Regions:
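Conserved, structured C-terminal
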Residues: 53-345
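Cytochrome P450
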Residues: 40-51, 223
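Acidic, proline/glycine-enriched N-terminal capping motif
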Residues: 1-40, 45, 174
Length: 345
């Protein structure tokens, strides 16, 4: 099943709710379209992020990491909408990878060949009614299958059987961690702290700081929560930015060789703060770092203060060698680190 919360909103006119809550222009979304978005408090600080799917003219589904029922209900006062928490009723299975479409076409009544990136369609999978969205958390070609909880195991078994010829394997969040970092995708509670959970202002982030400029549509009409703060940040520039960081491999080799060791690479992504320095002064930190099996590089999602977030900036990242804290050279890069050509085809 999925680790995220799911909420349905419907009614004679539920469309105004999401344009009020999110910086995305949800009014423009067609039926069958999915939009990724963050949402903010009044100060433009992120509370959560997820997707809005327009399943019908007046039917929307929101996914989020945190329970959102109360937040939606508070903002829907006076609107003619019904908001329902469906996390326990709807299961979501994520099928990701270059062969995901081929596998789905084996077990679905309707072909997935025409389903575009970030679109959603009703289908039948192994005899069970499902909704399939071309979305995911890996940065690869992939789909998420939305099903009644009672049918989830049947659908899982059908997918495992259909994918057997292609070496399909179950995958947990720690494996997905490596893929999501390669794809430049951040995670709540790891790469940013929800504004309503932060102890101090410095722990909060804005969608512009998190690189979601493309999802903050300030040209859309009307008010949305956090709009004024985000307009101010857009004109003044962001104090911090989420960027990529590539560690120089030879620099790491030298640091480990000084202790008579080959470079020690963690077998999974490291969720933890690692300082980034310039000339001995800390200018930011890594929030998730990992060895990239695809790129054969040690990479990290990093938060950097202005002006150090410009691509190409040479910095040092803290690494530990034999219980000693040392600093490996590296450079700031744009995200994503990797995007396969077939992802959006």
């Amino acid at each position: 099943s999925s680790r995220f919360m799911k909420t349905m909103t419907e009614g004679p006119n539920p469309a105004p709710l999401f344009p009020k809550l999110t910086p995305r222009d949800v009014h423009k979304m067609a039926v069958g379209q999915v939009g990724y978005t963050g949402w903010c408090d009044e100060d433009g600080k992120m509370l959560d992020d997820g997707t809005v799917s327009r399943l019908g003219e007046n039917l929307f589904r929101l996914t989020s990491a945190e329970p959102s029922l109360r937040w939606l209900s508070m903002n829907a006062v006076g609107m003619d909408v019904t908001i329902t928490e469906v996390t326990e009723q709807v299961a979501a299975l994520s099928l990701q990878g270059p062969k995901s479409r081929t596998v789905l076409n084996r077990v679905c009544a309707k072909s997935l060949d025409k389903l575009k990136y970030f679109r959603v369609m009703p289908n039948t999978l192994a005899g069970k009614p499902v909704t399939i969205s071309r979305t995911g958390y890996t940065g690869d070609l992939g789909y998420e299958i939305w099903i009644d909880v009672a049918d989830a195991l049947h659908v899982w078994d059908a997918l495992m059987a259909a994918g057997n010829d292609y070496g399909i394997v179950p995958c947990g969040i720690l494996a997905m961690d490596m893929a999501r970092v390669e794809a430049g995708l951040f995670m709540i509670d790891v790469d940013y702290t929800a504004a309503n959970h932060a102890w101090i202002e410095g722990q909060k982030s804005t969608p512009l700081e998190m690189g979601l400029d493309w999802a903050v549509q300030l040209d859309k009409p009307g008010y949305f929560v956090g709009r004024r703060a985000l307009e101010r940040e857009k004109s003044e520039g962001s104090a911090w930015k989420l960027m990529g960081f590539e560690v120089d491999w030879e620099s790491m080799e030298r640091l480990f060789a000084a202790s008579g060791l080959p470079p020690q690479i963690p077998g999974m992504a490291v969720r933890g703060s690692l300082p980034l320095l310039l000339g001995g002064n800390q200018v930011g930190y890594a929030s998730t770092s990992t060895w990239s099996p695809v790129l054969k590089k040690y990479i990290a999602l990093v938060h950097l203060q202005r002006p150090y977030y410009e691509p190409g900036t040479q910095l040092q990242m803290e690494i530990t060698v034999e219980h000693k804290r040392l600093h490996a050279n590296g450079k700031v890069v744009k995200l994503p680190f990797y995007e396969p050509e077939w992802k959006k085809k």
